[in-house]
Amino acid sequence: MTRVKRGYVARKHRKNILKFTSGFQGAHSKLFRTANQQKMKALAYAQRDRNNRKRDIRRLWITRINAACRNNGIVYNGIIHSMSEKKVHLNRKILAQIAILDSNSFFGIVKEIGM
């Protein structure tokens, strides 16, 4: 087989990896092999946590709606069930914002759906 001299391509590749890991501690920012492993791990963690953030935000909305409901003596699943029966199309994000910013409107919505 013929010899392939990678030249500047290999240097550019290594330089980009080390540039990405420049803020990491110790050998993870100095040595190419460990830096490459840490870059892959960092990107995997980033993707995982982007998905987990969606889960956590939805959990926060539900907690806020539930807290506002319990101030009025209602439970969360009751209000969600009533909204689906009455065909009220408000998602949890909007409902949580209404509950926090304008509680009078929230209780108006609760009365409207018959809770």
From Swiss-Prot:
Pfam family, one: Ribosomal_L20
Superkingdom of the organism of origin: Eukaryota
SUPFAM superfamilies linked to this entry: Ribosomal protein L20 (SSF74731)
GO biological process, one term: ribosomal large subunit assembly
PROSITE patterns found in the cross-reference section: RIBOSOMAL_L20
Record CDD domains: Ribosomal_L20
GO CC, alphabetical: chloroplast; ribonucleoprotein complex; ribosome
NCBIfam families: rplT_bact
Name of this chain's protein: Large ribosomal subunit protein bL20c
Source lineage: Eukaryota, Viridiplantae, Streptophyta, Embryophyta, Tracheophyta
